């Protein structure tokens, strides 16, 4: 995605599987089931197909856990925020209601985009975020602003910031995994519980705590995420042998 190659991406997985199945690029040995390897680990997938269309994809994500509680960082011109940091395939700073932040609904998307990189930089400068079993996975990459849901049946709402200036239009698969891990660690979710997550535009993912797990000496969960994707087009890239830059170039 725009921020580079991540250890894991939930909405990207849902989209990729939908595209690959609908276009016949892969044929699973057992219809409706497959697994993929990601930098974060193996992800098991089920999908529901009606005719030639994939109507739902559910991924069983890597073990997810609460990394730290109550970390604080000062944002210049705004003030101090406290966050929990959880891992769901990427590290997320989760911003819940507090003195300077009541609900994401009080902020425009542009305001969240302005605050997020400052908060991320401050947290990365002050704290270390390293996966206990996969030390190559390190650094806080995403900010998850929370809020009350607006859609019927939703449990919670979020705005997930990533990259330089992007907010996820989906509820974010790894972000939903991280949020469920945070809530499970605090006794607010148990194995078998569902968690319906709403995005900034109102789209929904269906999360579920599938099992308990351990990551190093940390209690963790195995979350699953269900959602759908629709194809919107194809892009054709070709190489002109007359182009001296046909194979790319670097500036920085």
What spans do the regions from the language model cover?
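Active-site proximal loop and beta-alpha junction motif in alpha/beta enzyme cores
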Residues: 1-8, 13-252
């Amino acid at each position: 995605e725009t921020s580079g190659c991540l250890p894991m991406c939930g909405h990207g997985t849902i989209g990729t599987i939908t595209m690959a199945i609908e276009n016949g690029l892969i044929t699973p040995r057992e219809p409706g089931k497959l697994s993929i390897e990601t930098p974060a680990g193996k992800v098991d997938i089920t999908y529901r197909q009606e005719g030639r269309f994939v109507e739902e994809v559910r991924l069983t994500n890597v073990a997810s856990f609460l990394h730290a509680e109550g970390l604080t960082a000062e944002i210049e011109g705004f003030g101090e925020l406290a966050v929990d940091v959880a891992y769901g395939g990427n590290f997320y700073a989760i911003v819940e209601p507090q003195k300077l932040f009541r609900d994401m609904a009080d902020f425009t998307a542009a305001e969240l985009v302005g605050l997020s990189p400052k908060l991320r930089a401050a947290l990365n400068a002050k704290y270390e975020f390293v996966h206990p079993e996969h030390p190559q996975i390190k650094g806080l990459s995403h900010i998850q602003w929370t809020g009350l849901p607006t859609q019927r049946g939703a449990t919670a709402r979020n705005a997930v910031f990533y990259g330089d200036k992007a907010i996820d239009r989906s509820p974010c698969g790894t972000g939903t995994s991280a949020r469920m891990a945070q809530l499970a660690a605090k006794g607010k979710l148990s194995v078998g519980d569902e968690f319906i997550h709403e995005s900034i535009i109102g789209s929904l993912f269906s999360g579920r705590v599938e099992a308990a797990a351990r990551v190093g000496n940390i209690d963790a969960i195995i979350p699953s995420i269900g959602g759908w994707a629709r194809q919107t087009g194809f892009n054709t890239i070709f190489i002109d042998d007359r182009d001296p830059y046909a194979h790319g170039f670097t500036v920085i």
